[in-house]
């Protein structure tokens, strides 16, 4: 029988800065070699739970503990964080907190150097993990020079290289491009099978991770565990839907066409579902579905729920021959980019990690100055504007909220940008409270920012930019770390802004977001724009998707197996997305 490895008995934890517990009466045993998925709404206690396993609580985050937690025979409150780290490896949500080396290679090698391994062995292992994670060409880079996605991979390599018996992944797949995410999901499976590691994974985005390889799924709600059972039962009992957690799109589609999920022996094994018998049954069910969302004469037209379009008389933003590199010895991050963006559009920018997406946004906003090229806003050259002047016209919400936050409380952070605008305190309070309510943060108005979850901090940074009412809003992965409720609130709010004429640019790895909310997609590859078209056309260009590390959502994977023509598949996909959106099964 497997050995109990992680034991929580009547365990509660309350941060000193909060009035109520973040974990309340947790009773749980995780056995050696189990692979566990942990889900729940923002602020439900998931990340705090992992911090109690790796020792960050109580050693780095103080608070009141009652009950008992035992990690690999070590009592949590009686064991120092170093001893726990020998058994527990954590890949954090915020990778910048993990780097200790001056270069990526040094950072990956850090744990092995502490163990005084021979240099030849260290070199061999560093190169092996760098190759497995696609980091070979970045070993000499400073960690701070990497894209957020490559930072995530580097931090993973630094943990995986010393093979701890317990591995914790705290939203660690969220910054990865779709192909890298799929590779990392496969790597986690391989590590679990090869080393029999005990693995705990926290994820909000279940599209390509929820499958039958997990032994258990644990659901947190209001600081308690409300579900601890198999992933199959999770779907059959509609636990995700009840909790407002987005289920994989193909699951929503199966429900929509009336398929009895309990009759499917391989419900969470998508490749097995693609058998001929099932495909034929799915096809018949779709044929019987009488609704029609679009004209079949134009299968690639925009989905009907897109916002009102504004007449593009002239571009609002023009990029002319923009090139940029960080240091002269390094190749260009952006290569001779020229682009016209029109007012009132919601645009997505996609591409593999390191393709130049975030750098392009920083150049537009003035955080980085291009070596060549011109940027025009409403035909005005932005070169001579100060960073403050440009920020009043173009708002930028960074991927990592910790790179933006500078104040102690929620109110102070949102009010900061308004202080120089000659507004009365009453006017400032009115604007701050209104935007906090929109972002579902009004109940935290006087709370210290340090007490917020990562997802709540993300919404806070969005609020701090939106309160300035910019003409163009650029968001780098705005929904990372958000549960379905807050994901939908953010995107619905962005749609309302877009309907008012604000041009919105979203950098994302979320293919569902791209397909459901944006009217146009730019695809970057090695610092160049190689596609500028509608999201649906991106998904029908398989060579483009393979070249740029874009993976189709699970619904598309399923539809591609149907015995239809390409045009029929495009019509079907558009219909299904409209149906799911309409019935609130998906994206709401």
Curated annotation (Swiss-Prot):
Q: What is its EC number?
A: 7.-.-.-
**Short name of one Pfam family for this protein?**
ABC_tran
Q: Does the keyword Cell membrane apply?
A: yes
Judging by the UniProt lineage, the source's domain of life is Bacteria
**Record bears the keyword Translocase:** yes
Example GO CC term: the record gives:
ATP-binding cassette (ABC) transporter complex
* Residue runs in coiled coils: none
Q: Where is the ABC transporter domain?
A: 6-247, 317-551
Please tell me where ATP 2 binds in this chain.
Answer: 351-358
**Where is this gene product found?**
Cell membrane
| SUPFAM superfamilies documented for this protein | P-loop containing nucleoside triphosphate hydrolases (SSF52540)
Which PANTHER family does the UniProt record give?
ABC TRANSPORTER ATP-BINDING PROTEIN BC_2655-RELATED, HEAVY METAL TRANSPORTER
Q: What does this protein do?
A: Probably part of an ABC transporter complex. Responsible for energy coupling to the transport system.
Q: What is this protein called?
A: Putative ABC transporter ATP-binding protein PAM_020
Q: Which organism is the protein's source? A: Onion yellows phytoplasma (strain OY-M)
Lineage, opening ranks: Bacteria, Bacillati, Mycoplasmatota, Mollicutes, Acholeplasmatales
């Amino acid at each position: 029988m497997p050995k109990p490895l992680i034991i929580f008995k009547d365990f509660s934890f309350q941060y000193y800065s909060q009035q109520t517990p973040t974990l309340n009466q947790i009773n749980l045993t995780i056995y050696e070699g189990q692979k566990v998925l942990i889900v729940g709404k923002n602020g439900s206690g998931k990340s705090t739970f992992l911090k109690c396993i790796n020792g960050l609580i109580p050693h780095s985050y103080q608070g009141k503990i009652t009950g008992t937690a035992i990690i690999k025979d070590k009592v949590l409150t009686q064991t120092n964080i170093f001893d726990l780290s020998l058994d527990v490896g954590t890949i954090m949500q915020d990778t910048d907190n993990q780097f200790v080396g001056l270069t990526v290679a040094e950072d990956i090698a850090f744990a092995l150097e502490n163990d005084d391994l021979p240099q030849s062995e260290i070199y061999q292992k560093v190169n092996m993990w760098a190759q497995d994670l696609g980091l070979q060409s970045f070993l000499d880079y400073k960690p701070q020079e990497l894209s957020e996605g490559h930072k995530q991979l580097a931090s993973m390599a630094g943990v995986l290289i010393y093979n701890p018996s317990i591995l914790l992944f705290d939203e660690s797949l969220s910054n990865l491009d779709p192909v890298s995410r799929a590779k990392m999901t496969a790597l986690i499976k391989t590590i679990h099978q090869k080393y029999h590691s005990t693995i705990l994974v926290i994820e909000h985005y279940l599209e390509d991770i929820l499958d039958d390889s997990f032994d258990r799924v644990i659901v947190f709600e209001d600081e308690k565990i409300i579900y601890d059972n198999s992933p199959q039962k999770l779907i059959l009992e509609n636990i995700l839907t009840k909790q407002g957690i987005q289920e994989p799109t193909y699951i929503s589609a199966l429900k929509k066409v009336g398929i009895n999920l309990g009759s499917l022996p391989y419900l969470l094994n998508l490749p097995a579902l693609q058998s001929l018998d099932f495909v034929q049954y799915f096809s018949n069910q779709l044929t019987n579905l009488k609704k029609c969302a679009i004209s079949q004469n134009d299968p690639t037209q925009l989905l009907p729920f897109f916002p009102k379009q504004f007449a593009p008389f002239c571009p609002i933003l023009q990029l002319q021959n923009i090139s940029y590199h960080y240091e002269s010895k390094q190749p260009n991050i952006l290569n001779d980019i020229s682009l016209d963006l029109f007012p009132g559009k919601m645009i997505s920018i996609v591409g593999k990690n390191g393709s130049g997406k975030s750098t392009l946004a920083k150049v537009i906003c003035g955080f980085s100055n291009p070596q060549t090229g011109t940027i025009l806003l409403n035909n005005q050259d932005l070169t001579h504007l100060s960073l403050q002047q440009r920020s009043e016209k173009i708002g930028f919400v960074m991927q990592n909220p910790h790179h933006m936050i500078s104040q102690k409380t929620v109110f102070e952070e949102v009010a900061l940008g308004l202080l120089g605008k000659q507004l009365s305190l009453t006017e400032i309070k009115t604007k701050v409270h209104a935007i906090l309510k929109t972002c579902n943060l009004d109940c935290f108005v006087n709370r210290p920012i340090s007490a917020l979850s990562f997802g709540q901090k993300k919404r806070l940074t969005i609020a701090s930019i939106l309160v300035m009412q910019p003409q163009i809003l650029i968001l780098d992965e705005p929904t990372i770390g958000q549960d379905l409720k807050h994901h939908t609130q953010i995107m619905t709010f962005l749609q309302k802004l877009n309907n008012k004429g604000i041009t919105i640019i979203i950098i994302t790895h979320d293919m569902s977001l791209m397909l459901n909310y944006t009217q146009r997609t730019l695809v970057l590859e090695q610092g160049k724009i190689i596609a500028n078209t509608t999201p649906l056309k991106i998904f029908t260009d398989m060579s483009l998707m393979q070249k740029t590390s874009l993976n189709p959502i699970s619904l598309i994977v399923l539809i591609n197996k149907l015995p239809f023509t390409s045009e029929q598949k495009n019509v079907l996909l558009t219909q299904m997305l409209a149906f799911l959106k309409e019935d609130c099964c998906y994206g709401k």
